[in-house]
């Protein structure tokens, strides 16, 4: 699977897993969260005797009835210093274990570059790890990693890169030097480049073998058009000329430079030692040759349209969505949209989509919603599920109906409380290690967030009410405008796709 297909598959899996796709059986059927549970302990029509004792909760109701004091958590605050060239470094001491974490994050990626750099930018994170350094060929880097128990992490998206290294304190000299070499002096070994290119070519040719990933990729392409968010890796992107060491080095110079970077160090190292090492390695790092041009905002498709990809498969993938309208920031609509999304489909088995599609109707193992937001522009609000071909139209209508229900009727207090508690209490897992705390601060700086963003976010989420959820759903979510994309065997659908809206067939 290609880099973009893999990332989309990961997104798809994350959405589905977040919606509770864990068990194979259906188990006991819990009540829908927006409805009173039916009383199955007495015959129909029989009323409980006056003054009868209330029945104690059983099964899942016992767990849902549990209440805990609200979690109060204050993360340690990293220190911050600058190198002689202005590069910011975050530092957090932690001597509880003989470990040191080194982190570099960069603003940049294929979203900032022309299409002919798409493959080079996509390959960058992988080749920083596998492509060697100017001092060491790839196999020598592998030997160092194994001999000194170094743990190297690389990651990328359309707009960010990360290169992190974890090492035992006693191996810090070796680990730090290798980390700095990977950042400043990558080799981009031609054989490793060709290996990456060959794998991506095969993945691009086989993308249709993965219907779930195909649905997400094609949906993004439909919604975002010729915007980086909608790009799909194609063989024409993967020519040797577009992935040469020279092109990789030129792309590296554009992105991996001080004005795009933030560094971090945490663990068993003093601040003075961290300053010395960082200044020696990065204090004279040459400035960026040019300023990266900010990506243009996407023009997201509006208006009902049904897109169908015919595949001879027993299960359909359904994706629905529209422009989400909400921007990430310290505002009521953003916080209310977080709670609304959790209730709609982000809260696992407690979410309405899972309740309706799985528990009530038995149409799917799971379903999930997403409500994207960025500081610069709106993203997508929508949902995704898989269902058997013969229930495709019914499942699609049920998703849209659940959304319509949420935009016309406020959620219950208990739904909002559960969503709020889940988000707030889950926040602690964003700070399970000093490295995570430092990395969070680095990301906030790259995104120009206020330093107290975390506390603002928690306060904003805690202030959400059922009324504000109803308001944000009513103003920003309209199922009648949703774009629908279905991958499946149309001949086995429980109706024609045209009953949902005007149909366009896609041929990837």
What is each model feature region?
Residues 47, 51-59, 225, 229, ...:
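An aromatic/glycine/proline-enriched structural segment found at the starts
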Residues 103-166, 231-233, 347-365, 375:
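M16/MPP (pitrilysin/insulinase) zinc-metallopeptidase core fold and M16-derived inactive scaffolds
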Residues 57-81, 221-261, 293-298, 324-328, ...:
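Histidine-acidic residue clusters that define the catalytic metal-binding segment
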Residues 199-218, 297-316, 355-364, 409-460:
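Short acidic/His-enriched helical or mixed secondary-structure segments at domain edges of catalytic enzymes
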Residues 21-71, 262-264, 385, 418-508:
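C-terminal regions of mature proteins
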Residues 25-35, 40-58, 140-251, 297, ...:
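Acidic/histidine-enriched segments that form metal/cofactor-coordinating
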Residues 212, 216-217, 221, 245-281, ...:
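Non-catalytic, conformational "gating/processing" segments within enzyme and secreted inhibitor domains
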Residues 22-24, 130-136, 165-197, 347-348, ...:
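M16/insulysin-pitrilysin zinc metalloprotease superfamily fold
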């Amino acid at each position: 699977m290609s880099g973009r297909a893999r990332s989309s598959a990961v997104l798809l899996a994350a959405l589905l897993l977040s919606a509770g796709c864990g068990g194979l059986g259906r188990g006991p059927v819990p009540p829908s969260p927006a409805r009173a549970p039916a009383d199955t302990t007495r015959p129909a029509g029989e009323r409980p005797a006056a003054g009868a004792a209330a029945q104690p909760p059983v099964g899942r109701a016992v767990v849902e009835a549990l209440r805990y004091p609200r979690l109060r958590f204050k993360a340690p605050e990293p220190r911050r210093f600058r190198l002689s060239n202005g590069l910011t470094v975050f530092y957090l001491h932690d001597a509880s274990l003989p470990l040191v974490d080194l982190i570099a994050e960069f603003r940049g990626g294929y979203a900032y570059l022309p299409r002919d750099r798409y493959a080079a930018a996509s390959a960058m994170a992988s080749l920083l790890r596998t492509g060697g350094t100017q001092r060491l060929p790839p196999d020598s880097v592998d030997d160092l990693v194994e001999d000194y128990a170094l743990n190297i992490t690389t990651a990328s998206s359309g707009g960010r890169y990360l290169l992190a290294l974890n090492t035992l304190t006693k191996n810090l000299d070796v680990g730090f030097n290798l980390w700095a070499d990977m950042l400043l002096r990558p080799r981009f070994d031609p054989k490793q480049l060709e290996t990456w290119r060959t794998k991506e070519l095969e993945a691009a040719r086989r993308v249709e073998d993965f219907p779930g990933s195909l649905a997400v990729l094609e949906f993004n392409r439909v919604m975002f058009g010729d915007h980086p968010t909608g790009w799909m890796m194609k063989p024409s992107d993967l020519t040797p000329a577009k992935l040469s060491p020279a092109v990789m080095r030129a792309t590296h110079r554009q992105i991996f430079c001080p004005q795009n970077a933030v560094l971090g160090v945490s663990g068993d190292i003093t601040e003075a030692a961290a300053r010395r090492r960082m200044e020696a390695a990065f204090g004279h790092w040459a400035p960026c040759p040019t300023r990266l041009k900010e990506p243009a905002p996407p023009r997201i498709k509006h208006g009902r349209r049904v897109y169908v990809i015919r595949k001879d498969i027993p299960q359909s993938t359904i994706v629905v969505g529209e422009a989400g309208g909400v921007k990430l920031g310290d505002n009521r609509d953003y916080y209310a949209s977080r709670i609304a999304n959790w209730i709609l489909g982000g809260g696992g088995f407690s979410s309405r989509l899972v309740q309706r599609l799985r528990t009530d109707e038995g149409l799917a193992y799971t379903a999930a919603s997403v409500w994207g937001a960025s500081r610069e522009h709106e993203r997508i609000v929508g949902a995704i599920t898989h269902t058997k071909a013969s229930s495709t139209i019914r499942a699609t209508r049920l998703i849209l109906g659940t959304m319509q229900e949420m935009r016309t009727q406020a959620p219950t207090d208990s739904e909002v409380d559960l969503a709020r508690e889940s988000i707030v209490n889950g926040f602690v897992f964003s700070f399970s290690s000093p490295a995570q705390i430092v990395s969070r601060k680095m990301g906030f700086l790259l995104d120009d967030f206020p330093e107290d963003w975390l506390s603002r976010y928690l306060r904003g989420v805690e202030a959400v009410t059922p009324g504000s959820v109803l308001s944000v759903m009513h103003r920003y979510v309209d199922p009648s405008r949703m774009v629908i994309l279905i991958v499946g065997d149309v001949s086995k659908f429980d109706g024609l796709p045209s009953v949902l809206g005007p149909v366009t067939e896609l041929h990837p």
